[in-house]
Amino acid sequence: MRTIIVGGGAGGASCGARLRRLDEKSEIIILEATDEISIANCGLPYYCSDVINDREKILVSNPQTFKQLLNVDVRLNSKVTSIDRKNKKVAINNQTELSYDNLVLALGASPLKPSINGIDNPKIFTVRTLSDADKIKEFIIKNNVKNAVVIGGGFIGVEMAENFIEMGLNTSIIEL
């Protein structure tokens, strides 16, 4: 029995671990489109400000650990580009096909980009992945940024603002 889990965030990683506890023999494959699995998203603001200065501390796990501890095959940079439900196959990166007995979609969330003029400006960032946080850090350092505006007053938005202030940036929050 082969189960394919599409998405390697917290939900996909937890699903893989739970499935392994329920069945020690089945084949479990996690397909993650990015180059990271199961990151500590709540730590991203603190990574941006270097309160957490070790990038590896944001990574909750890695493919090798999943294989060693759980016998779960994690494949990074493996974007599912189509699903053939009738024949029970997924296409990966428009190249490889994998068959499955069970399919779990654990696609997670994506940041909301409000419909406002200029939202696609290269100086505007979303923060959802470790790669996003890397880009924010790099931009702030490279451009000697002094001011920041955070759109969104949820947990991550407030923590981003807190950490921008920690970095010495004049920071405002806009809640839509």
Where are these regions (language model features)?
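FAD-binding core/adjacent interface of flavoenzyme oxidoreductases
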Residues: 1-4, 59-151, 166, 172
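Beta1-alpha1 glycine-rich phosphate/pyrophosphate-binding loop at the start
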Residues: 1-72, 163-176
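N-terminal Rossmann-fold NAD(P) dinucleotide-binding loop
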Residues: 12, 157-158
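Conserved acidic functional residues
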Residues: 84, 159, 175
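Short, glycine-/small-residue-rich phosphate/pyrophosphate-handling segment
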Residues: 153-155
